[in-house]
């Protein structure tokens, strides 16, 4: 499995989902959390493609034994946008502030 590593970061930082092109402060966790996982609070590695293995178990990563010389492996990675919309249903908002700005006030709160 020769996967390209896109990002290594801390999930607890407030800007783990932002890039140098998209400067909005957002977490890497999508709205509602990852499906059957939840909220990312620790360090994480973002790789290209998928990774085989049991759900929620440790996956060991190691450096490749041979040096990669192809253009696809040697080109520099620059992420332009990380989608953090909900993975449940038809998510279209990147964070709660964007959702509140679009939908407006949904419920009238009484002062009782």
Language-model-detected regions and their locations in the chain:
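Low-complexity, rRNA-contacting terminal tracts
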Residues: 1-112
């Amino acid at each position: 499995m020769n996967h390209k590593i896109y990002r290594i970061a801390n999930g607890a930082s407030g800007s783990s989902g932002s890039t140098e092109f998209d400067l909005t402060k957002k977490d890497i966790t999508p709205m509602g959390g990852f499906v059957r996982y939840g909220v990312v609070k620790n360090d994480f590695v973002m790789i290209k493609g998928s990774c085989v293995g049991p759900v929620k178990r440790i996956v060991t990563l190691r450096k490749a034994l041979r040096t990669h010389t192809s253009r696809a492996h040697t080109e520099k990675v620059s992420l332009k946008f990380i989608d953090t919309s909900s993975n449940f249903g038809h998510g279209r908002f990147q964070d709660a502030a964007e959702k509140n700005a679009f939908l407006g006030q949904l419920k009238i709160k009484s002062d009782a």
